[in-house]
């Protein structure tokens, strides 16, 4: 009887650890309520368009839709989350400005990305010619994606 209880407890613990993340607030997920995060991340998107135009962004993952955001020049939008146990967490954003748009991944499981983000904080900046990622390893913004023409 003791082994059955231990087995059921082990199964329950496994299910809790592998449950999908759902963003409840800026820095809380459903898994955080039961189990601490293994790795916590923050993604930031900033409007660095020197033309003064508004940057429209719509970011989401498989489980979380962060909604439509309009960023004025120098405004930022950030969110926090814990990477899931399967290391399959993926966030992407649609972004547009007056004369361009793009669909771009802003977080995925990749050691090179993690190194550039200093293993905790990915900062993306929309500039006139495209989207840049702050590379903390070299201390500068690096062009990641160019704008596509049109809306």
From Swiss-Prot:
PANTHER family (UniProt xref): PLANT SELF-INCOMPATIBILITY PROTEIN S1 FAMILY-RELATED, PTHR31232
Cell compartment(s), UniProt: Secreted
Secretion signal, residue range per the UniProt entry: 1-25
Swiss-Prot/TrEMBL keywords: Secreted, Self-incompatibility, Signal
Gene encoding the protein: SPH74
Protein family membership: Belongs to the plant self-incompatibility (S1) protein family.
Lineage, highest ranks first: Eukaryota, Viridiplantae, Streptophyta, Embryophyta, Tracheophyta
Gene Ontology terms: cellular component: extracellular region
The protein's name: S-protein homolog 74
A biological process term (GO) from this entry: rejection of self pollen
Pfam family, one: Self-incomp_S1
């Amino acid at each position: 009887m003791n082994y059955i209880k231990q087995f059921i407890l082990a199964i329950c613990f496994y299910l809790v650890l592998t449950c999908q993340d759902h963003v409840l607030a800026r820095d809380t997920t459903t898994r955080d309520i039961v189990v601490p995060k293994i790795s916590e991340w923050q993604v930031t998107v900033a409007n660095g368009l020197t033309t003064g135009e508004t940057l429209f962004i719509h970011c989401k993952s498989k489980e979380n839709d962060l909604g439509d955001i309009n960023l004025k020049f120098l405004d930022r939008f950030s969110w926090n989350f814990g990477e899931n146990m399967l290391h399959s967490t993926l966030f992407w954003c649609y972004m547009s400005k007056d004369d361009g748009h793009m669909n771009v991944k802003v977080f995925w499981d990749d050691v090179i990305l993690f190194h550039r983000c200093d293993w905790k904080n990915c900062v993306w900046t929309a500039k006139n010619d495209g989207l840049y990622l702050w590379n903390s390893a070299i201390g500068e913004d690096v062009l990641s994606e160019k704008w596509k023409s049109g809306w």
